[in-house]
């Protein structure tokens, strides 16, 4: 069978093989560097790290399915050629199509869930948490719904690899599912991109620091794989365009090369982007500090190791801060301003108490 298939004109399956051979090691290296960066700090493995591991397993399995589709299911050859030389290969192709589409739907959101968990740790504001939780629900719902639709979209199940007439009669509109299945990814990508920007830019910090932080989140959200390819948002859009412009069922084995590349690339880019966001300790170890230090209003400078955007902590037992800078003041006439109320508290005597919330750096730890 291999010799017959290799004789096909315009064979393009090798492109998919080369892509998998290059891209899969990149994801493995990215995850390995993430955990090495974590080992440089006192941080323990958390739920976000386990999601990254699961996403990497999903990426490796997807690469295996893609290679199997090339070797056993005729991907890269024209369907007409396969119909003449080896019709059974087309049946194998549609079986691989079910496996690939179901696996993609159920695993592509894992790395983005890890990013959501990271954002929840960085941004403690209640409103931000509501947006993040909603985004996570959308991701989980899209994964479960998409996976079930891909897997059980045909009744009987064997209609998945039946003739075109059988698929039309017994299956949902699978092509529309493939096209619009990426749309929730685009929406959640935009949310994760926009979410940190107002908070970061509103910090009482230098313009340089704010620019560095904005670029950090920007690289993780849009240019997450700047050194190796496209970005999470860009790959979602390009995958959507590819599926929209190229029918999955017109010369499917030939068009599958490009479509599978985007299907493997998209979650892999999310995975690399999620890893890039926590490389700060690694970059500092090799002499590439992202920020030289942060100066607070009190004049203290600390080397940043973990970025957090925290609410002011409530003093215990109603205690109040009795000193500002090097001087001291009486606690008379001052009250604690709640986390959700940042308005100045005006008391008798013309005293105004305000709280400035700035970047907090936790020494000896990393995101």
From Swiss-Prot:
Entry annotated with the keyword Acetylation: no
Ranges annotated as spanning the membrane: 16-36, 50-70, 90-110, 137-157, 183-203, 211-231, 259-279
GO cellular component: membrane
Residues of this chain annotated as glycosylated in UniProt: 133, 245
Keyword vocabulary terms for this entry: Glycoprotein, Membrane, Transmembrane, Transmembrane helix
Compartments it resides in: Membrane
Pathway in which the depicted protein is active: Secondary metabolite biosynthesis
Membrane protein topology class: Multi-pass membrane protein
Induction cue: Expression is induced under mimicked-infection conditions.
Domain of life assignment: Eukaryota
Entry's family note: Belongs to the SAT4 family.
Role played: Part of the gene cluster that mediates the biosynthesis of (2Z,4E,6E,10E)-9-hydroxydodeca-2,4,6,10-tetraenoic acid (BAA), (2E,4E,6E,10E)-9-hydroxydodeca-2,4,6,10-tetraenoic acid (BAB), and (2Z,4E,6E)-octa-2,4,6-trienedioic acid (PBA). The highly reducing polyketide synthase Ba17a is sufficent to produce PBA and BAA. The still to be characterized protein Ba17b leads to an increased production of BAA as well as to the production of the new compound BAB.
Protein name per Swiss-Prot or TrEMBL: Polyenoic acids biosynthesis gene cluster protein Ba17b
Organism this protein belongs to: Metarhizium anisopliae (Entomophthora anisopliae)
Gene field: Ba17b
């Amino acid at each position: 069978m291999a010799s017959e298939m290799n004789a096909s004109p315009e064979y393009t399956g090798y492109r998919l093989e080369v892509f998998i051979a290059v891209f899969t090691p990149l994801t493995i290296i990215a995850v390995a560097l993430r955990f090495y960066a974590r080992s440089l700090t006192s941080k323990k493995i958390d739920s976000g790290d386990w999601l990254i591991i699961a996403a990497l397993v999903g990426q490796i399995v997807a690469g295996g399915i893609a290679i199997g589709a090339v070797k056993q299911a005729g991907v890269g050859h024209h369907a007409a050629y396969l119909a003449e030389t080896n019709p059974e290969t087309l049946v194998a192709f549609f079986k691989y199509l079910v496996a690939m589409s179901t696996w993609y739907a159920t695993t592509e959101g894992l790395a983005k869930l890890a990013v959501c968990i990271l954002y929840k740790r960085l941004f403690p504001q209640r409103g931000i948490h509501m947006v993040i939780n909603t985004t996570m629900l959308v991701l989980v719902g899209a994964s479960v719904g998409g996976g079930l639709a891909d897997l059980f979209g045909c009744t009987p199940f064997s209609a998945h690899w039946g003739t075109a007439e059988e698929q039309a009669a017994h299956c949902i509109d699978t092509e529309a599912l493939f096209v619009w299945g990426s749309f929730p990814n685009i929406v959640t990508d935009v949310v994760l991109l926009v979410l940190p920007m107002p908070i970061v830019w509103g910090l009482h910090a230098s313009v340089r620091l704010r620019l560095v932080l904005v670029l950090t989140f920007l690289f993780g959200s849009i240019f997450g794989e700047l050194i190796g390819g496209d970005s999470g948002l860009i790959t979602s859009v390009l995958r959507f365009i590819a599926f929209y412009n190229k029918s999955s069922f017109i010369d499917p084995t030939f068009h599958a090369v490009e479509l599978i590349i985007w299907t493997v690339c998209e979650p892999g880019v999310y995975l690399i982007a999620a890893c890039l966001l926590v490389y700060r300790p690694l970059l500092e170890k090799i002499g590439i500090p992202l920020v030289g230090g942060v100066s607070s209003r009190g004049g203290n400078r600390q080397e940043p190791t973990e970025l957090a955007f925290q609410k002011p902590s409530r003093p215990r037992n109603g205690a109040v801060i009795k000193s500002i800078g090097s001087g001291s003041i009486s606690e008379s006439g001052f009250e604690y301003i709640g986390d959700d109320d940042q308005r100045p508290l005006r008391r008798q005597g013309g005293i105004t108490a305000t709280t400035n919330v700035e970047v907090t750096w936790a020494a000896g730890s990393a995101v």
